[in-house]
Amino acid sequence: MKRSYSYILSLLALLLTVSGIHSLGVLANPQLAQHKPKNESKYTDLTLKKDSTEIVLPLDENEELDFSLVHTLEYEEDASLPFIKNETPTPWADSVFNSLTVKERVAQLFMVAAYSNRDAAHKTELIKLITEEKIGGLIFFQGDPASQMELTKCYQDITQTPLWLGMDIEWGLSMRLSNSIHYPYQMTLGAMDNDSLVYEMGAQIAQQMKRMGVHVSFSPVLDVNNNPNNPVINYRSFGENRENVSEKGLMYIKGLQENGVLACAKHFPGHGDTDMDSHLALPTVNHNRNRLDSIELFPFKNAINEGVGSIMVAHLHIPVLDNRENRATTLSSATVNTLLKKQLNFKGLSFTDALNMKGVAKYFQPGEVDLEALKAGNDVLLFSEDVPQAIKKIMAAIASGEISEETINTRCLKILKTKEWLGLNKKEKLDKTDLVKDLNSEEFNWLNQRLADASITLLRNENNTLPFLKINENKTAVI
């Protein structure tokens, strides 16, 4: 039977380590062994932080310390963001909003694809969208750190309203950028017992994002991957256990948001039990509502209750939610307005998945899909195929009463409040000096080692195939 490469990777991820043999984490990634901090003595006490109070647990100087358990955490009692609770004054957002025309408010809802490894024509096209259409943000894809920072400075210098920048950073900047840290896939993290390490990873990723001038991480994946034939989620999920997915997802979200970047949980209402890639077609999920509530929606409900700032809506066909033919959840008011915003009481930002994906793009003309996504209740339109045409369609819909100006105003102001929370009311200082060095610090690499150590799991060792009983007498091959 043929198995995809990603399927094999997912199996290898589950086979990462042996309980009780901590040192084998180095075997999982031997290059990381060299990144053990030189000033290891700073780890001789275990420090826990809550609010401003530190609790130090001294360790005997002769006691061997398990580095996978060392962490410094600072949790907030309430993880809700100010722009969600709508209680914190946002003078900058209010001022900018009042300065924009209706068309410019519509343009704030668009986040357009950007690459730092493409030619001058791509850059020229983006400059036109920024200066003429006055789009709200960019989602960066493939490239390298220095080139992306150069482009970021260029685009921010020419925009009327500061751009917010997003990236898919599920396992770190390396998902899109060269010369950056590659943290473990979520399936690997799903094998860990120590969830606090996921918080630390989220916090480090937030630090690296801010160094790059990036504000939104389209992560974590909260899909419960209960279909072994899933071609697109697979190792990107924390696994098939809903509690494990939820708990680790929450730690990832808090690590990001408590360190100043916006998390975006995906792919609502759950892309785990599919056997089709929504980049290529529209997958159907035929479960009843009770099943969706108990499995697929479980991690999202918990994330909403804990204050996740944004959620990405998937391109799925779920007849129990909306039985119109070829109607994706992204374009379904029953899914976004009714289920997500009313029934689950989500007050944050809802992003569409990329609107150029065949799961939606094959059924609508450019511009039409954007309007349908807005009517469904989405706040941010990601990767539109034709921004000028989409803005024209939306403006015509406002004029005809198909969508209200008040709806546009509400969503635009929510985006501007988010930008203010992200610090975009102040000019960012972007400096390429030592950029790659900063993104690959000893501290970051050492956490990567601890994540590898903590994720090692022995599923079965029949007939002592793995020679751990005589580890000094045998050689172990690492694949």
What residue spans do the PLM features occupy?
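Second-shell residues forming the walls of enzyme active-site clefts
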Residues: 101, 138, 148-163, 173-175, ...
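A substrate-binding/cap region within the structured catalytic cores of diverse enzymes
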Residues: 192-214, 221-249, 253, 257, ...
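Short glycine-enriched loops at secondary-structure junctions
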Residues: 114-118, 165-175, 215-225, 265-271, ...
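Active-site-adjacent structural elements in enzyme catalytic domains
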Residues: 145-162, 195-213, 406-413, 417
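Preference for extracellular/luminal or secreted protein segments
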Residues: 2-6, 10-14, 20-112, 116-128, ...
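Short, acidic/polar
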Residues: 118-131, 198-205, 293-300, 365-370
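Catalytic domains of carbohydrate-active enzymes, especially glycoside hydrolases
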Residues: 125-141, 203-216
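Active-site mouth loops of central-metabolism enzymes
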Residues: 109-120, 186-199, 281-295, 357-364
